[in-house]
Swiss-Prot record:
Top enzyme class: lyase
Residues that coordinate or bind Zn(2+): 279, 343
Disulfide-linked positions: none
Name this protein carries in UniProt: Phosphomethylpyrimidine synthase
Organism encoding this protein: Synechococcus sp. (strain JA-2-3B'a(2-13))
């Protein structure tokens, strides 16, 4: 779809959406996003120019259907997929991608660390995906030196970043905010460093007693991103991995650095979103969102949950969706889903489905709470369908129509029950929605009440 759009941009030193937005240009991607969001194109342009919105759209991902991430637009949901050395491979991950898109993922991250040729897996995912694809390039960089962290060099990392940009990756998690001087701050944590990328870089810094190479080479990464329009997703390497560690000195020190890196990228018109926690008690979520907005000048906030309790193993998609809904309400722009397998194992296709639906609920609830225009229209239509016992319409309006139909038909499978004025919960005699309060009856009641003596 985008081949003609990007053809005339090729060869330019800077092809980012932010660069064009700051020149006053409304790109085809901005026009497309404006239609999807039902917002004025000029608003999209101004938000991208300001840095409050990003349109992750690598010029080499030509089959992409552009979308945006930002406070002015709908709250978005990301789904993580990816093969591992011990489970899954290309075929399974392509099936997960298909399911993720079916159930409403706005972006997908390929977090493959094994299971085959990583370049082959990534290329296949990009070619099959109409939604933006994100990656964490430090994973492949480590794989390129056979997992030996101490042998990893800045050149190895930059080579992988450039290669993934050429392949069409739309945004990359870059863990540039974890500095060597922050490592002692995790001494009193219960769970230390829980970011895989952050852990890799921490081990590298401990081995070499040198500064984080992603930080020292951040300008080199900016130059790569300018050429392909790759967006930064600044990784929170020191995010809390449990409630005990939330909002601590280590997390907030890194957040300040992420703000500095955001402004550095903006100086070169490179798009940025900032990643956030993690595991956060409900009463600290608003603080975390407000603090990110303050430190990072309102760059879009992309949160992993957060989980609001640490004891829901097997149900962390629920624990985290609670936190995600609150974060979205307070201003987070994108929610990274958590599946029931979080902390337990690699998610399968059904886990992807359950995690995504939980997060679509959270994002939608946030949009309603933020009074986004039209956010509640579908809910009101569902309510009308319920009141009219229009079962098929109820299924259609559900976030997961197949599951809604499956649960209804579990007890009342016959077609005749698709027009019945009850379900198996109340049966034919006790459903309160059968009590129709028609206008004529209510008018008569009002007249009766008005005629009653007062006092």
């Amino acid at each position: 779809m985008r081949s003609e759009w990007v053809a005339r941009r090729r060869g330019q030193a800077n092809v980012t959406q932010m660069h064009f937005a700051r020149q006053g240009v409304i790109t085809e991607e901005m026009e497309y996003v404006a239609q999807r969001e039902n917002l004025p194109p000029e608003l999209i342009r101004s938000e991208v120019a300001r840095g409050r919105m990003i349109i992750p759209a690598n010029i080499n991902h030509t089959n992409l259907e552009p979308m945006c991430i930002g406070i002015a637009s709908r709250c978005k949901v990301n789904a993580n997929i990816g093969a591992s050395p011990t489970s899954s491979g290309l075929a399974e991950e392509l099936e997960k991608l298909k399911l993720a898109i079916k159930y409403g993922a706005d972006t997908v991250m390929d977090l493959s660390t094994g299971g085959g040729d990583l370049d082959e897996i990534r290329t296949a995912i990009i070619q099959a995906s109409p939604v933006p694809i994100g990656t964490v390039p430090i994973y492949q960089a480590l794989e390129s030196v056979h997992g030996k962290v101490e042998k990893l060099s800045a050149e190895d990392i930059l080579h992988v970043i450039e290669k993934q940009a050429q392949q069409g990756v739309d945004y990359m998690t870059i863990h540039a905010g974890i500095l060597i001087e922050y490592l002692p701050l995790v001494r009193h944590r219960l769970t230390g460093i829980v970011s895989r990328g952050g852990g890799i870089l921490a081990r590298w810094m401990l081995a070499h007693h040198k500064q984080n190479p992603l930080y020292t080479h951040f300008r080199d990464i900016i130059e790569i991103f300018k050429k392909y329009d790759v967006s930064f997703s600044l990784g929170d390497s020191l995010r809390p991995g449990c409630l005990h560690d939330a909002s601590d000195e280590a997390q907030l020190a890194e957040l300040k650095t992420l703000g500095q890196l955001t402004r550095m990228a903006w100086e070169h018109d490179v798009q940025v979103m900032v990643e956030g926690p993690g595991h956060v008690p409900m009463d600290q979520i608003e603080f975390n969102v407000r603090k990110q907005m303050e430190e990072c000048d309102e760059a879009p906030f992309y949160v992993l949950g957060p989980l609001v309790t640490d004891i829901a193993a097997g149900y962390d998609h629920i624990s985290s969706a609670i936190g995600a809904a609150l974060a979205g309400w307070y201003g987070a722009a994108m929610l990274c889903y958590v599946t029931p397998k979080e902390h337990l194992g690699l998610p399968n296709a059904e886990d992807v489905r359950n995690g995504l639906i939980a997060y679509k609920i959270a994002a939608h609830a946030a949009d309603i709470a933020r009074h986004r225009p039209g956010a509640r229209d579908r809910d009101d239509e569902m309510s009308r369908a319920r009141y009219n016992f229009d079962w098929n319409r109820q299924f259609e309006l559900s976030l997961d129509p197949e599951r809604a139909r499956e649960y209804h038909d579990e007890t009342l499978p016959a077609d005749i029950y698709k027009t019945a004025e009850f379900c198996s919960m109340c049966g034919p005699k006790f459903c309160p929605m059968q009590t129709k309060m028609d206008a004529e009856a209510l008018s008569e009641l009002e007249q009766f009440l008005a005629a009653q003596p007062t006092g």
